[in-house]
Amino acid sequence: MRLIGMPKEKYDPPDPRRIYTIMSAEEVANGKKSHWAELEISGRVRSLSTSLWSLTHLTALHLNDNYLSRIPPDIAKLHNLVYLDLSSNKLRSLPAELGNMVSLRELLLNNNLLRVLPYELGRLFQLQTLGLKGNPLSQDILNLYQDPDGTRKLLNFMLDNLAVHPEQLPPRPWITLKERDQILPSASFTVMCYNVLCDKYATRQLYGYCPSWALNWEYRKKGIMEEIVNCDADIISLQEVETEQYFTLFLPALKERGYDGFFSPKSRAKIMSEQERKHVDGCAIFFKTEKFTLVQKHTVEFNQVAMANSDGSEAMLNRVMTKDNIGVAVVLEVHKELFGAGMKPIHAADKQLLIVANAHMHWDPEYSDVKLIQTMMFVSEVKNILEKASSRPGSPTADPNSIPLVLCADLNSLPDSGVVEYLSNGGVADNHKDFKELRYNECLMNFSCNGKNGSSEGRITHGFQLKSAYENNLMPYTNYTFDFKGVIDYIFYSKTHMNVLGVLGPLDPQWLVENNITGCPHPHIPSDHFSLLTQLELHPPLLPLVNGVHLPNRR
């Protein structure tokens, strides 16, 4: 997921000439509701009522020109405050909890008795104005503050030097959904899907709440590799893998652990210099060679597919073709040993193939049409790959559905989107709202399983029967930033061939709250995405005799 920018949306400070009105008795009697988002307390006040901290609707609080000598930690309960004026008081210190008020855009502390500032103020990444004049602060602090863009430099300095508690992440729970079949032959394997957050996207402009040292790739890559190694999946699908890091980090490290891999960068790499090309991100698939053998590998460039299927559609040319996202797919042969002793397919000569597809769709929420069409293009291309693979010598039949599919992706789309509806339900209406009423109808039929001349009844369909491994809100979010928290990463599988035995559950949300983690990356969490991990059970297409009868496929 890419964020447009952080956190510089327009901020309008309170109007100093603000006026108020008192409702009449008649207005009160008629049920008129009062609305006041600002509060001013003045008159040489020395202490504040604890009831003030219950006014959580406040967005502006004026406490200036009083005799306050301390501010209690409970002020952090006013989590909607964007403006706080504590100027011209007698404050000698500030509570560390002030750093939890991450909605603040303006914090005025002028003309107090402050000698030190809590480094927790560095967490106020949305702060645009920090007033510190007239305080006996150390020269080091003042030097930073008085620089051009001093507020930002000072906040960055405090965040980068804020002590991080050494406690480790609590383990994510394994959720068992089904026991493995003990009667019918089956193979079991695990699949990981993980957006590792490419280095060039990990900037303070996008992730201002994360210390710069914890955004640094040299730091983050250790946590990312630790996550991958600890999951120990049989198949790994990664998004946002930088080209250079694939060849210098991921492939060598995983080859040592018995994997082979396939990678393709985004299409822009083709028109770049060799030096620039190193930093283009793309998608990678790794698999354990003791369990799978590579049969085919494919790259799907969405802009090329869009160009070939535009049929004169301006929207297709101007909106879809201009995005250089890609997908990759591999056809694997599943080793017979995975089916266990005495649990092999009926014909020993048969090869059990498996296709694994991995993609990263366009990020912008305003381009729901592009995401949906990219998904359709990818599924259509995977269908072509399957048709070719299914006609290979030794494969069971020419039917694409005879080869099971695992599709991993950062779809940048929520569970209620047209993208997920299309994948889960086998199709989507050609006038779905996600198409934004743009003129795609003719070219969309190129991606329907019925073909351009088939009967689609107003739907764009695909021939796969797919199901998400993470159903029923097993994960409340897969992408966790300050501005956005939601499910946008998925593992789909062929439900005619496979069952889900279990999935890796979510990180304890209470731990995130207790540690004031409002977004990732974080010193303990190296990406803005959480990994997905599932265990799948694969049944071969030809089942053995049970009591003299061939059992039908049960799904």
UniProtKB/Swiss-Prot annotation:
Changing D489A: Loss of deadenylase activity. Residues 158-555 are annotated as: Nuclease domain. GO terms for molecular function: 3'-5'-RNA exonuclease activity; metal ion binding; poly(A)-specific ribonuclease activity. Binds 2 magnesium ions, but the ions interact each with only 1 or 2 residues. The active site is at D410 (proton donor/acceptor). It is found in: Cytoplasm; Nucleus. Highly expressed in placenta, skeletal muscle, pancreas, testis and leukocytes. Weakly expressed in heart, spleen and thymus. It is an enzyme of class 3 (hydrolase). It catalyses: Exonucleolytic cleavage of poly(A) to 5'-AMP. Changing F484A: Loss of deadenylase activity. Gene3D superfamilies: Endonuclease/exonuclease/phosphatase, Ribonuclease Inhibitor. LRR repeats lie at residues 57-78, 80-101, 103-125, 126-148. InterPro entries: CCR4/nocturin_mRNA_transcr, Deadenylase_CCR4b, Endo/exonu/phosph_ase_sf, Endo/exonuclease/phosphatase, Leu-rich_rpt, Leu-rich_rpt_typical-subtyp, LRR_dom_sf. Substrate binds at E240, E276, H360, P365, N412, N479, F484. Mg(2+) 2 binds at D410. Inhibited by free AMP, and with lesser efficiency also by CMP, GMP, UMP, ATP and neomycin. Coiled coil: none annotated. Its main location: cytoplasm. Belongs to the CCR4/nocturin family. Depletion of CNOT6L causes cell growth defect. Has 3'-5' poly(A) exoribonuclease activity for synthetic poly(A) RNA substrate. Catalytic component of the CCR4-NOT complex which is one of the major cellular mRNA deadenylases and is linked to various cellular processes including bulk mRNA degradation, miRNA-mediated repression, translational repression during translational initiation and general transcription regulation. Additional complex functions may be a consequence of its influence on mRNA expression. May be involved in the deadenylation-dependent degradation of mRNAs through the 3'-UTR AU-rich element-mediated mechanism. This is CCR4-NOT transcription complex subunit 6-like. It comes from Homo sapiens (Human). The gene is CNOT6L.
